[in-house]
């Protein structure tokens, strides 16, 4: 039996905290479980091992939410708050199975207080193979080529992070915002 796990910060519960469409275990983030919770959120089934023994959780294996949790068309923010959403792409497609449907978009009132941070198309085009590394790289490239490309992308992303910090420190973020 699968059960969802929502790790949350008690100071700021997400607007979807009380959803009940699937069995849901709610776990408060703490210094003792933060690292394991982040590791579990990236543990892609059949690719990376799940995480066991996370402090404050029921027994079991914790891993990436997969099909039911990718880009749900739900409100991202409470009315008076904003959500900062780092993402690979400059758009959000609700529904994991619909990600190839380029015209599918979330309901506007679900993302009207979302600040999406993503690399530009020009940045991605300059990366090795003109794309962001993904799990298909394991099948498409030999290990040495895959590692080389991933390291180049990490270096490029370090520069991107430095640029973002500079924009924030100089209070230039508002000038860079575009409507979703």
PLM regions and their residue ranges:
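Patatin-like phospholipase
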Residues: 1-180
């Amino acid at each position: 039996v699968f059960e969802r796990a929502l790790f949350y910060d008690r100071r700021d519960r997400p607007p979807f905290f009380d959803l009940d469409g699937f069995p849901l275990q709610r776990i408060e983030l703490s210094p003792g479980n933060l690292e394991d919770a982040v590791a579990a959120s990236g543990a892609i089934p059949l690719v990376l091992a799940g995480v066991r023994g996370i402090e404050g959780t029921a027994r079991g294996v914790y891993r990436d939410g997969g099909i039911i949790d990718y880009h749900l068309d739900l409100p991202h923010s409470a009315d008076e708050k904003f959500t900062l959403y780092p993402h690979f792409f400059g758009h959000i497609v609700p529904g994991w199975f619909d990600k190839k449907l380029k015209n599918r978009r979330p309901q506007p009132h679900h993302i009207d207080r979302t600040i999406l941070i993503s690399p530009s198309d020009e940045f991605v085009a300059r990366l090795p193979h003109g794309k962001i590394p993904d799990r298909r790289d394991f099948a498409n490239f030999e290990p040495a080529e895959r590692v080389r490309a991933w390291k180049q992308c990490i270096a490029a992303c370090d520069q991107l992070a430095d640029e973002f910090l500079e924009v924030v420190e100089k209070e230039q973020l508002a000038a860079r915002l575009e409507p979703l």
